[in-house]
């Protein structure tokens, strides 16, 4: 039986692997092979495959039986190319051992350099190089790294010894130490290793090698790597490869160096060689921050004001070679590259290339410029941008150079940064805003009653609630930064203070919140403003040309509608009319309606609301022009509009001239144990049809008014919420149709409109065929459909959902990304049954899922006509919809 190939060699212009073998060789191994194949100077070496890592964990941390022989053969081949021999006393081959997963995981797993050094080979290296200091310096580095990575001995043990030696000899820098100093330190290092591990430092290079290989495979399961994988959705099953490579030394004197470079600026995307290097150093010195790195280009040196020479000046030949290679690599990989290199006695060697990590701003510029340079197509440019990353570009962000004094941290619930005075009451937020102040609203949690304060605030901070809490959803809808669930924060409404970590801040003090990271910062922190022109606009045009799915916005106010148009929305997919009722001048009329003893009294109160609603709808229709507007009839339970607590009830009763007891009794009467499943949605319209009639009249009169004014047809879409049966929809539609006839007769204008429903209950999804006989459109209310399908309250789920996702019970938070198997199945069933009965039925989703890239992809697969999301997430949905369309085309091809 043929043995499996576990080891892939590269060196001397030939390699067993290729760049498309990342799954087997990891990103680093595949790219080392590719660079070798295209003729770049890469030190010879070999890659042990990711399959060995999988075997290692499946077989109690042992290796396939034929691995050892393959490693020995590859080591011998590296020796032939370099003219050295591993473990040889006269001319030893030294190697590096590095990890390399499929997906780039910078700094997450372990590396060992200078492996093969021992008490004997260090003398041979000193003699061959003619530099004893270099040899001893390399050996002490190896002992430190190997002891930490393989033997588990903390760095501080070695740092203490080094600092003690420097103090006793009056040295300030590592470069002050000579060969004898390092030799003395090495003796102490080895003594410390034996003290800590109970064994002498290993002297056999082969034992060292297998120890390092095992440690690199072992590092796949260290905590920081596990955390990184979870944050970046990298499966544990992928495993890592191990790369063993002949050492080249950047610490062999003034003609040697080590560095890291990017082919374009990773922060801005500018097409310039960007990076840092250090003369007479090894790779870890650049990232460790022990010495200040030098600039690669002379231009960058001038900009930074550094007096240290650039690589361009200090090493002109190596710099010219690096420039040639960086251009060749970018052309070959058709993307911005992150390079690691070493210069050994004037010769440049490439140690790594990979697609470079970049900011969203840089990613946009790089994708558009690569397409303009004809290196990639426009469609490929569209697929290169992570839709969720656009969040970084649509809100002000904290200046990366700014100092951060962190007060407390919570969840990054709504992106962007905001700064203002601390306030604890929504009323005060509104008052101070009217006086020209900028405020941050701090609440334990928010409710619909706080909406005016949230609207007035620059940003919102809550101590309770998750990423899909009321505060988070409303803040995202408004495009306001929000940090939620800051559990260690204590808010005292009475004292008007907030306390975290022993620090107390008072009302009126300045606070900055970063909704992109969840950090809450003391004082005013500098910010950068978003720009939506240039590359952003170009890429959005390319995305729009590729997508089929329409993108609408959820908008409840004229400001929302204007933002929706600005971000490219193709209509309003959800206008929640209840948000219009919380303004101070309206809430009183709403409360009068709720307190009314009979229908006649309710109609009197509703008559006061009619002109206000009509004005709201007219403004929305005017802003949106010919684009569709879907208006949802009143949905929340009535008790949400009433005051809570004795003090507030007394205050409201006095302002209304009502009896406090009557108000208190009515509030108690309307109180529900489970309001989410209670007296709300179409149930209100059936029990109190006059509410739906008033709203329908306001919609139709506004449509007629705007149609006359603009001389363009306005066709509103009226959505009936929370229906479970066709009979419910039929009843409410009868009332809407009756009002439409009346308005048409009164205005002598035909009234065109559509009536549809929100599918947010499992029964409605299952009976979609029947419901489609009446409904002209369905909008899937995925927030409530998820709650009712799972039997989970969204506002209470934060306490346990993270446990579910961490343990793999659920792949992700179903309130963030649609649960394809359950909720998704209900959407699929409703789509099929609805279309069977009414071929031209319009289908979309409202709610926050409409702005989640994974959910948008699902909507495209199911064949919905549109998604609707908060205005600030519209560009994200547009890009995700384009990527979904391109993926479907690719699948068909």
Show the residue positions of the predicted features.
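S4-like RNA-binding module at protein N-termini
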Residues: 70, 488-521, 526
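A short, small-residue-rich loop immediately preceding and capping a beta-strand
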Residues: 458-464, 482, 844
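C-terminal accessory/binding modules appended to enzymatic or scaffolding proteins
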Residues: 14-21, 414-456, 823-840
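Nucleotide/phosphate-binding sheet-loop regions of phosphoryl- and nucleotidyl-transfer enzymes
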Residues: 1-405, 431, 437-440, 447-452, ...
């Amino acid at each position: 039986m043929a043995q499996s190939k576990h080891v892939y060699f590269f060196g001397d212009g030939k390699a067993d692997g290729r760049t498309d073998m990342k799954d087997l060789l990891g990103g680093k191994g595949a790219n080392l092979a590719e660079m070798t194949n295209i003729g770049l100077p890469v030190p010879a070496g070999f890659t042990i495959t990711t399959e060995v890592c999988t075997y290692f964990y499946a077989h109690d941390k042992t290796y396939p039986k034929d691995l050892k022989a393959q490693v020995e053969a590859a080591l011998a081949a590296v020796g032939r190319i370099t003219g050295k021999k591993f473990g040889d006393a006269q001319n030893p081959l030294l190697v590096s051992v590095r990890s390399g997963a499929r997906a780039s995981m910078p700094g997450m797993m372990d590396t060992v350099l200078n492996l093969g050094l021992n008490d004997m080979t260090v003398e041979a290296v000193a003699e061959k190089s003619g530099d004893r200091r270099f040899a001893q310096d390399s050996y002490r580095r190896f002992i430190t790294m190997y002891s930490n990575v393989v033997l588990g001995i903390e760095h501080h043990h070695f740092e203490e010894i080094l600092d003690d030696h420097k103090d006793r000899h009056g040295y300030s820098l590592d470069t002050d130490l000579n060969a004898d100093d390092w030799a003395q330190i090495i003796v102490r290092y080895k003594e410390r290793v034996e003290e800590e591990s109970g064994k002498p430092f290993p002297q056999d290079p082969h034992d060292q090698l297998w120890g390092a290989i095992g440690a690199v495979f072992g590092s796949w399961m260290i905590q920081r790597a596990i955390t990184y994988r979870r944050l970046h959705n990298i499966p544990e099953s992928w495993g890592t490869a191990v790369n063993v490579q002949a050492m080249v030394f950047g610490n062999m004197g003034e003609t040697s160096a080590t560095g890291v470079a990017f082919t374009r600026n990773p922060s801005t995307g500018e097409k310039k060689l960007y990076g840092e290097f250090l003369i007479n150093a090894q790779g870890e010195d650049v990232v460790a921050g022990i010495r200040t790195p030098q600039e690669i280009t002379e231009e960058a040196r001038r900009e930074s004001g550094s007096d240290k020479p650039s690589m361009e000046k200090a090493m002109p030949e190596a710099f010219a070679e690096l420039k040639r290679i960086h251009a060749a690599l970018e052309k070959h990989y058709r993307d911005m590259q992150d390079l690691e290199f070493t210069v050994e006695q004037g010769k440049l060697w490439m140690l790594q290339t990979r697609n470079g990590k970049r900011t969203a701003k840089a990613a946009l510029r790089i994708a558009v410029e690569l397409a303009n340079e004809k290196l990639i197509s426009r469609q490929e440019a569209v697929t290169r941008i992570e839709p969720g990353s656009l969040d970084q570009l649509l809100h002000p962000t904290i200046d990366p150079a700014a100092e951060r004094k962190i007060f407390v941290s919570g969840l990054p619930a709504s992106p962007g940064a905001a700064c203002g005075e601390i306030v604890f009451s929504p009323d005060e937020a509104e008052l101070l805003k009217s006086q020209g102040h900028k405020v941050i609203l701090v609440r334990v949690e928010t409710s619909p009653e706080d909406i005016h304060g949230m609207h007035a605030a620059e940003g919102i901070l809550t101590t309770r609630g998750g990423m899909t809490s009321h505060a988070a959803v409303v803040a995202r809808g408004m495009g306001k930064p929000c940090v939620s669930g800051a559990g260690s924060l204590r808010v005292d409404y009475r004292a008007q203070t907030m306390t975290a970590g022993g620090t107390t801040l008072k009302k009126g003090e300045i606070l900055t919140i970063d909704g992109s990271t969840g950090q809450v910062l003391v004082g005013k922190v500098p910010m950068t403003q978003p720009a939506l022109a240039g590359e952003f606009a170009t890429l959005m045009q390319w995305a729009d040309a590729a997508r089929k799915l329409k993108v609408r916005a959820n908008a409840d106010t004229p400001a929302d509608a204007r933002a929706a148009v600005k971000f490219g929305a193709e209509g309003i997919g959800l206008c929640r009319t209840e948000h219009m009722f919380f303004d101070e001048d309206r809430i009183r009329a709403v409360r009068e309606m709720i307190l009314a003893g009979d229908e006649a009294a309710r109609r009197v109160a509703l008559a006061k609301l009619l002109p206000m609603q009509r004005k709201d709808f007219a403004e929305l229709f005017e802003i949106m022009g010919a684009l569709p507007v879907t208006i949802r009839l009143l949905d929340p339970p009535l008790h949400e509009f009433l005051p809570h607590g004795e003090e507030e009830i007394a205050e409201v009763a006095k302002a209304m001239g009502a009896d406090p007891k009557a108000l208190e009794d009515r509030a108690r009467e309307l109180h529900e144990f489970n309001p989410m499943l209670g007296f709300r949605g179409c149930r209100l319209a059936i029990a109190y049809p006059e509410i739906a009639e008033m709203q329908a009249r306001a919609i139709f009169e506004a449509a007629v008014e705007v149609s006359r004014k603009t001389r363009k047809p306005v066709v509103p879409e009226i959505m009936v919420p929370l229906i479970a049966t066709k009979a419910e929809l039929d009843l409410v539609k009868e009332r809407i149709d009756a009002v439409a006839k009346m308005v048409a007769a009164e205005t002598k204008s035909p009234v065109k409109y559509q009536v549809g429903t929100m599918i947010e209950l499992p029964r409605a999804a299952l009976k979609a065929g029947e419901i489609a006989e009446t409904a002209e459109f369905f909008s899937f209310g995925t927030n409530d459909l998820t709650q009712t399908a799972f039997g989970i309250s969204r506002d209470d789920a934060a306490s346990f959902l993270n446990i579910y996702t961490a343990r793999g019970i659920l792949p992700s938070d179903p309130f963030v990304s649609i649960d394809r198997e359950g909720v998704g199945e209900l959407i699929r069933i409703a789509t099929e049954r609805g279309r069977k009965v009414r071929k031209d039925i319009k289908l979309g989703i409202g709610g926050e899922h409409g702005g989640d890239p994974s959910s948008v992809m699902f909507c495209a697969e199911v064949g919905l006509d549109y998604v609707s999301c908060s205005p600030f997430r519209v560009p994200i949905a547009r890009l995700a919809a384009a990527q979904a369309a391109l993926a479907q085309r690719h699948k068909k091809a």
